[in-house]
Amino acid sequence: MNIHNEQFGRFFNEFKVGEIYKHSVTKTITESDNNLFCLLTMNHHPVHLDKEYATNKTHGEILVVGSYIFSLVVGMSVKDISGKAIANLNYEKVTHDKPVFIGDTLYAQTEVLDVRESKTKSDRGIVYVETIAV
């Protein structure tokens, strides 16, 4: 019988272009989560904190801070993607296609777009990925 332990991260040679990792970690956003992130980052815009103010704006309810969503999605991918990485070198494009509200649950997945050896460090490689949340 083979017993496999859950893997935390992957080594460079384990990544294959086209592979998709559906991240098992999910997150339901609470009002406390959003409030704490606003406090920590000093983002006190009332659309993120004031229910009465937000009710009279475009979305009609409190809008969760986009940078919090970005942070969560990156965090959701760590176990599968960057757990063994030396560094996250770059984030090329961050978009928020839909608003996120208190009570929404986020799911994320990452697709491997490209894998190449480093041009400057022969013992390393670079993995290009696209991570999306739904």
Where are these regions (language model features)?
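Short histidine-centered beta-strand/loop micro-motifs
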Residues: 61-62, 85-86, 98-99, 119-122
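Glycine-rich loops and low-complexity Gly/Arg-rich segments
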Residues: 46-51, 88-89, 97, 113-114, ...
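Mid-chain, well-packed structural core segment of small domains
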Residues: 84-89, 94-102, 108
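Hot-dog-fold acyl-thioester-processing enzymes
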Residues: 1-91
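HotDog/MaoC-like acyl-thioester-processing domains
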Residues: 1-17, 100-105, 109-134
